[in-house]
Amino acid sequence: MEVVIVPDAKAGGELIAEAMAQLLRRKPDALLGVATGSTPLPVYEALAAKVRSGAVDTAQARIAQLDEYVGLPAEHPESYRSVLRREVLEPLGIDMDAFMGPDGTAADVQAACEAYDTALGGSGGVDLQLLGIGTDGHIGFNEPCSSLASRTRIKTLTEQTRIDNARFFDGDIEQVPHHVITQGIGTILEARHVVLLATGEGKADAVAASVEGPVAAVCPASALQLHPHATVVVDEAAASKLKLADYFRHTYAHKPDWQGI
């Protein structure tokens, strides 16, 4: 696991966007796994700027979804499919034909989960998976004590998560679905490169537990310690609880430029 400490969220976004751009230059049809939420927005904004400037071509790029609400129509403005269309696909000039995600409205949700897991493998696998992290260490909707070998499956949202997400539904918690489909931790770990971005002091404890703590289901993101190519990008605030922060700064500062992240 590599830990990169950057000054702020904008710098983190630019660093990860450049890693995605380098990947697309090597492999134009790369499958990028993307996450929703406010944390990854600087990544998408920086990558979109590269597309507009002609620094990278996304004509053949493909996008894979991390999770989706169950029972929310795909055309609903707050379905994650709609959110990703607005925040990722349209700014990057990628057609919906190049997008893959689970069917949250399927009559047989379990079959839909299994079908998406199979589709990810059949597509050749995710080349780079971008993740955020919750204050409790969750990745995707894999909450604490999720199996570290879990596959794409249905999960029940905690009441706190529904309260937190109500702001996207006009403040009405009754509109927030109770269930989601999420890639499992085992599924996430199959990506060739996993990049986790964390910003803000509120994520400091989770980052420290994930990077320097034991690999344990109580902190789902700690499973990234087992991945052969995992990169954790954090701003100074999110890095504030890391005991090895100076070591991480030193090693990255002296890393050969050609290695990237």
From Swiss-Prot:
The gene is nagB. Pathway: Amino-sugar metabolism; N-acetylneuraminate degradation; D-fructose 6-phosphate from N-acetylneuraminate: step 5/5. Its EC number is 3.5.99.6. Belongs to the glucosamine/galactosamine-6-phosphate isomerase family. NagB subfamily. It comes from Streptomyces coelicolor (strain ATCC BAA-471 / A3(2) / M145). The keyword Hydrolase applies. One of its GO terms (biological process) is N-acetylneuraminate catabolic process. Keywords: Carbohydrate metabolism, Hydrolase. This is Glucosamine-6-phosphate deaminase. It comes from the Bacteria. The active site is at residues 67, 136, 138, 143. Catalyzes the reversible isomerization-deamination of glucosamine 6-phosphate (GlcN6P) to form fructose 6-phosphate (Fru6P) and ammonium ion. Induction: Expression is repressed by DasR in the absence of GlcN6P. It catalyses: alpha-D-glucosamine 6-phosphate + H2O = beta-D-fructose 6-phosphate + NH4(+). GO terms for molecular function: glucosamine-6-phosphate deaminase activity; identical protein binding. One of its GO terms (cellular component) is cytoplasm. The keyword Hydrolase applies. PROSITE patterns: GLC_GALNAC_ISOMERASE.
